[in-house]
Amino acid sequence: MSNVCVITGGGSGMGLEAAKCMPKEKIIVISGRTLSKLEGAVEELKALGYQAYAKTCDTSDRESVRELATYAASLGEVKNVINSAGVSPAMKGTQEGILRINALGTVYVNQEFSKVMKPGSVIVDVSSNSAYVLPSFLINKKVYALAETDEETFLKKLVKKSNLAKGEYQRKGFAYSLSKNFVVWYAKKCAFEYGKQGIRVVSLSPGLIATDMGNLEKEDGGMLIPFSAEERMGRPEELGYALATVADERNGYLAGVDVLCDGGSTTGMKEFKKKK
């Protein structure tokens, strides 16, 4: 039976670059909301020698995620899931929409794919270094736990927290940071839950990356660039390689942690470049 790698948000950016770093003997399934973008990415992967398929999926819809998991499992044994689907504050949408896609979408992906995965497989949830700059008083893990038991209360409480910011963009920024802080927490929780099934779970937090989404955030997120070790944005291919490496089965002892891949900007801001 062939091994299958699923990448949500795989039609472009770091998700597509991660697909290009996977072994060519794997079947690659990329998903997203725009079929034309996915089809273009599939053609690009096929030209490189991959057996690749496109499947539309809205990760904020559990049934859509379930259909993706079922489809992937019909192609072979699902060994790698890289959940890179997400939205940022600069994109169209509301605070609740950001939380539904980034936070609840992660819950749906982890829960539905864990049902079709076997020992020796891995889920990599993509977070963001914005998870590390969130004021501590906004972080409430009891609220995070509601994501699995009471979704609407979970959303209402996090939207309320994000409303503490002034201005629409800032409120969306708080919602984004909350959603990504949740992803880090939830991936760790799943690591210990799914570890009993032999499924490894890790999160990876990029910094500002030169993708379409990253460029939208450059005006505000760019403030962190001077704090990075090389004082630059990350490149999609660098993050793609990092994701593929973390998702590699040979990295079997890497679980229950967040891999901070932001050029050192979080460390620089907190410890070494405070005067910049």
List PLM regions with ranges.
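Conserved glycine-rich Rossmann-like NAD(P)H-binding loop of the short-chain dehydrogenase/reductase
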Residues: E25-G40
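Short, flexible catalytic-loop segment of classical short-chain dehydrogenase/reductase
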Residues: Y132, S205-L216
